[in-house]
Amino acid sequence: MKILVVGGGGREHAIIKKIKENKEVEKIFALPGNGGIAADAECVNVGAKDIDGIVDFAVKNGVDYAIVAPDDPLVLGAVDALEEKGIPCFGPRASAAIIEGSKVFSKNLMKKYGIPTAEYEVFYDEESALEYLETAPVPTVIKADGLALGKGVIIAETREEAKNAVRSMMEDKVFGKSGDQIVIEEFLTGPEVSVLSFTDGKTVVPMVSSMDHKRAHDGDAGLNTGGMGTVAPNPYYTEAVAKECMEKIFLPTVAAMNAEGRTFKGCLYFGLMLTPKGPKVIEYNCRFGDPETQVVLPLLESDLLTVMRAVTEERLSEVEVKFSHKDACCVIMASDGYPEKYEKGFEISIPEEVAKNVYVAGAALKDGKLVTSGGRVLGVTAVADSLPEAIEKSYSLVEKIHFDNAFYRRDIGARALLAKEEN
């Protein structure tokens, strides 16, 4: 089988490494891939948003199955375009990817179908949003409607901060068209949990829960990032919580999408907050999370490609999806200065014995050498029998990898360890 994977980050590297385990796979193409993925797949210089280019390549190269990993191509209809050419895909069609593509859509969906989420208001113009903020309780949360590279959510501690956030989105257009309409919602408190799930529109199979670390610096200080590390499973996500989420959130969401004529097939990501009033949805993503994938897939004992194809063919209930009961920790090594300005082009040294634990994101090949090319450079994942062991193992591997201006948090998993002690 010839497999095409759209995307070029650490998440895609994790998917590709897992798919390589399937004996039927003879060739994997990554569009565009990256310098590290090149060790595991043939990277082709076609951008993830170039839908026509992706389809042309897939047809000309006799691709048997495509996996569209990032949000942009999913929202732009990459799956629709590939399926029209008879190429089966893993990932939702554009009509279903809107669950991430529009915050206004997803909030209204939850309201209509009684899925627990934060109270909210939608605004289509700056004036009415600013007027609303005069009396709105703070802290409050301002969200751009469309995709914004994970940076379109601002938690405002004061009214002035909230107003500035509205102005930056609606007047200054920092997120372009994504800020044409915005959601202002209540600020929720409680532990956050990420749950990725496989769904074929009928069955929902949650993967192992995980805990993300969004802030750039230790102690959850600094700016929000795409994620500086993850651990799995998330200790706050107990069996009782999982049962409640399945009944009140996971199954109702899939049923709601079906009722709207937007059947979702692929990986549906639930960003949850465990509030004093029960679990609530903070966000939906229409794809595997990054860096959650880098801890969840190493714990998957079933064959990933077999599960994905069952999703595509709407027979997920027929396959076994089994996860290990071990713990995993992923530490992201970034370029110093990320998520703001940073230098790139530094050579990366990864010892051979560590490479199998590394998922490369922001790196390119230059004269045959791997060099830094992005903010988040790579993720290092370790799996062990306990969380403390997984954390320790992950950091011991990090210390063996070198590049100038490397920077990483030194407290990934610390919050999870505290939670384990509390429980």
Annotated model-derived regions:
Residues 90-151:
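A conserved helix-loop-beta module that forms one wall/lid of the active-site cleft
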